Swiss-Prot record:
Annotated disease: Ichthyosis, congenital, autosomal recessive 3: A form of autosomal recessive congenital ichthyosis, a disorder of keratinization with abnormal differentiation and desquamation of the epidermis, resulting in abnormal skin scaling over the whole body. The main skin phenotypes are lamellar ichthyosis (LI) and non-bullous congenital ichthyosiform erythroderma (NCIE), although phenotypic overlap within the same patient or among patients from the same family can occur.
Source organism of the structure: Homo sapiens (Human)
Pathway: Lipid metabolism; hydroperoxy eicosatetraenoic acid biosynthesis; Lipid metabolism; sphingolipid metabolism
Cofactor(s) required for function per UniProt: Fe cation
Gene label: ALOXE3
Protein name: Hydroperoxide isomerase ALOXE3
Length: 711
């Protein structure tokens, strides 16, 4: 008689326990155990419980290959969900096999778990295990299906595919309700307390292993509803017309002010702070160093001489590498939209900036169109106060549009959704890259589904607050993806290509490069452990299918993007995986977390403009300035969005935090510990530096970075 001792851990989440019958079957190289029910006195499998059981066999089973978990009806109780974290099996000789699960098991089904040792397909030779990999991926591909949102967009998850699966196909796929079509607007309606329509059906059905936890859902609602109702009760969400004075805008979120929001309110109109935001604001990726002026921006030395001073000139500063350009060309053909029944306007500015000898980045000249001429004056710091402020505000509006649509939603949310989908569809649970990437895909499918149901849907928040509306968003993102490259995606390459490696006080760059290096070192150790040679990379058919699917579905097979369609060496793997993890975590934090801080003072990030860009100088006053900014209700709706996306709901997992132990071998566990140690040192360095800054830069402090795109 051989006795196997099982230790079963149920997740600590709300409603994670089950009343259903749980049985197991152990499968080894020498046979399999009888199916045995796990039952003790009292309740089994309560949330957070760790319980021990024995499985008796007539003989030892050899090396354990699979553990089958059977979930079946118990008496008259309704079927429920069970979150199984892991099962540890102590064999008769005292050795321990770990079977990670970390998934919701719904309904009545059988789930097959493999030991936690990560294995590529090249390392599996037994037909039983090869068949298991094939069946697992086939089931996942039936559950997680691709869907086209709009031409030129990265493909997304089709929530229609979360349907009842046959019990013998349930590996991690346990949704039991058929979904309504995501594009069907029949459920697109207003809810009390929310200023926009919400596509309710698309929110109701989400595969349980990718949806928000109850804790996160409740936290999100508690962030959203009071803020929205508070503005509603004060009449702000319904008040149309211009703001009467600038100071009135401070009352929108009077109870949600931060140190940074106060700093922005005090310094927003200063040229130094305008330039600072290109380095450490929410869109720190726009600047390019230039050695000559583009023909479409005919700035002369005489125009900028008063700012440059007598000791230098424009040509000299160009040659020294001190002149930078922010070019919003992508907005030139963007369609515009009506808000409150009034036409809105968009500019496509060119903003020239200078790095002064004092190390400050300041604007030199602003042209509000891509076509120079008499109707497109070049605005200068020497112009009247209101002319210059209005020109800068137009640039800030362009910053808002490019940041929200491309830098933020396209390049983090949508691309990371494609990475998550390819990982779920092409890599089995036992694959080392699945184990590496899974924590960095947590909740991404859910948050993007929420975004499409509340922001991108017809009459959603994008239609309610932006000058380009939903159709303009589609144009911007499709155009942005068509020009997005692998160089843009990889932080060190992007900084080098933009010529911004030497700018002082560029905290996004400095912190980002440290985090990139820490991720790269971690990934290099993991890849080196599982992929010792070029051949081991090239022969991994699952890895190549994963890479090819990302290339086809995220980047639409565009060769000019420079993204890999297959991986040939461990070095190529390390770079690609490092970039994915960085963009799913640190890059998203950098472009998301500060939105309320920098946008709560509305003139610093207006979502729309009600007057066309000025064609002459000398006509702007305070009144015309206020009449150009968004109306009161538009401003409040947009600031509500800023507030929500900047408040990470509960159930957070900071970068490098891996409570789900998918890796069970000692080598990757040591690599994880080393990664966490590096991140802790980076955090200490950032906090020490911030003590000497007038405005601390905290968005890339590792404890404040979420592992994944989850809000």
């Amino acid at each position: 008689m051989a006795v196997y001792r099982l230790c079963v851990t149920t997740g600590p989440y709300l409603r994670a326990g089950t009343l259903d019958n749980i049985s197991v079957t152990l499968v080894g190289t020498c046979g399999e155990s009888p199916k045995q029910r796990l039952d003790r006195m009292g309740r089994d499998f309560a949330p957070g419980s760790v319980q021990k059981y024995k499985v008796r066999c007539t003989a030892e089973l050899g090396e354990l290959l699979l553990l089958r978990v059977h979930k079946e009806r118990y008496a008259f109780f309704r079927k429920d969900s069970w979150y199984c974290s892991r099962i540890c099996v102590t064999e008769p000789d005292g050795s321990v096999s770990h079977f990670p699960c970390y998934q919701w098991i719904e309904g009545y089904c059988t789930v097959e778990l493999r030991p936690g040792t990560a294995r590529t397909i090249c390392q599996d030779s037994l037909p039983l295990l090869l068949d298991h990999r094939t069946r697992e991926l086939r089931a996942r591909q039936e559950c997680y299906r691709w869907k086209i949102y709009a031409p030129g967009f990265p493909c997304m998850v089709d929530v229609n595919s979360f349907q009842e699966m046959e019990s013998d196909k349930k590996f991690a796929l346990t949704k039991t309700t058929t979904c309504v079509d995501q594009g069907d607007s029949s459920g697109n309606r207003y809810l009390p307390g929310f200023p926009m329509k919400i596509d309710i059906p698309s929110l109701m059905y989400m595969e349980p292993n990718v949806r928000y936890s109850a804790t996160k859902t409740i936290s999100l609602l508690f962030n959203a509803i009071p803020a929205s109702l508070g503005m509603k009760l004060r009449g702000l969400l319904d008040r149309k017309g211009s703001w009467k004075k600038l100071d009135d805008m401070q009352n929108i979120f009077w109870c949600h002010k931060t140190f940074t929001t106060k700093y922005v309110t005090e310094h927003w109109c200063e040229d130094h702070f305008f330039g600072y935001q290109y380095l450490n604001g929410v869109n720190p990726v726009m600047l390019h160093c230039i050695s000559s002026l583009p023909s479409k921006l005919p700035v002369t030395n005489d125009m900028v001489a008063p700012l440059l001073g007598q000791d230098t000139c424009l040509q000299t500063e160009l040659e020294r590498g001190n002149i930078f350009l922010a070019d919003y060309w992508i907005l030139a053909e963007a369609p515009t939209h009506c808000l409150n029944g009034r036409q809105q306007y968009v500019a496509a500015p060119l903003c020239l900036l200078w790095l002064s000898p004092q190390g400050a980045l300041v604007p030199l000249a602003i042209q509000l169109s891509q076509t120079p001429g008499p109707d497109s004056p070049i605005f200068l710091p020497t112009d009247s106060e209101w002319d210059w402020l209005l020109a800068k505000t137009w640039v800030r509006n362009s910053e808002f549009l490019v940041h929200e649509n491309n830098t933020h939603f396209l390049c983090t949310h949508l691309l990371c959704e494609a990475f998550a989908m390819a990982t779920l569809r092409q890599l089995p649970l036992c694959h080392p890259i699945y184990k590496l990437l899974l924590p960095h895909t947590r909740y991404t499918l859910q948050v993007n589904t929420i975004a499409r149901a509340t922001l991108l849907n017809p009459e959603g928040l994008v239609d309610q607050v932006t000058s380009i509306g939903r159709q303009g968003l589609i144009y911007l993102m499709s155009t942005g993806l068509a020009h997005f490259t692998y160089t843009n995606f990889c932080l060190p390459d992007s900084l080098r290509a933009r010529g911004v490696l030497a700018i002082p006080n560029y905290h996004y760059r400095d912190d980002g490069l440290k985090i990139w290096a820490a991720i790269e070192s971690f990934v290099s150790e993991i890849v080196g452990y599982y992929y010792p040679s070029d051949a081991s990379v090239q022969q991994d058919s699952e890895l190549q299918a994963w890479t090819g699917e990302i290339f086809a579905q995220a980047f639409l097979g565009r060769e000019s993007s420079g993204f890999p369609s297959r991986l040939c060496t461990p070095g190529e793997m390390v770079k690609f995986l490092t970039a994915i993890i960085f963009n799913c975590s640190a890059q998203h934090a950098a472009v998301n977390s500060g939105q309320h801080d920098f946008g709560a003072w509305m003139p610093n990030a207006p979502s729309s403009m009600r007057q066309p860009p000025p064609q002459t100088k000398g006509t702007t006053t305070l009144k015309t300035y206020l009449d150009t900014l968004p109306e009161v209700n538009i401003s409040c709706n947009n600031l509500l969005l800023f507030w929500l996306v900047s408040q990470e709901p509960k159930d957070q997992r900071p970068l490098g935090t891996y409570p789900d132990e998918h890796f069970t071998e000692e080598a990757p566990r040591r690599s994880i510990a080393a990664f966490q140690s590096r991140l802790a040192q980076i955090s200490r360095d950032i906090q020490e530096r911030n003590q000497g800054l007038a405005l601390p830069y905290t968005y890339l402090d590792p404890p404040l970075i979420e592992n994944s795109v989850s809000i």
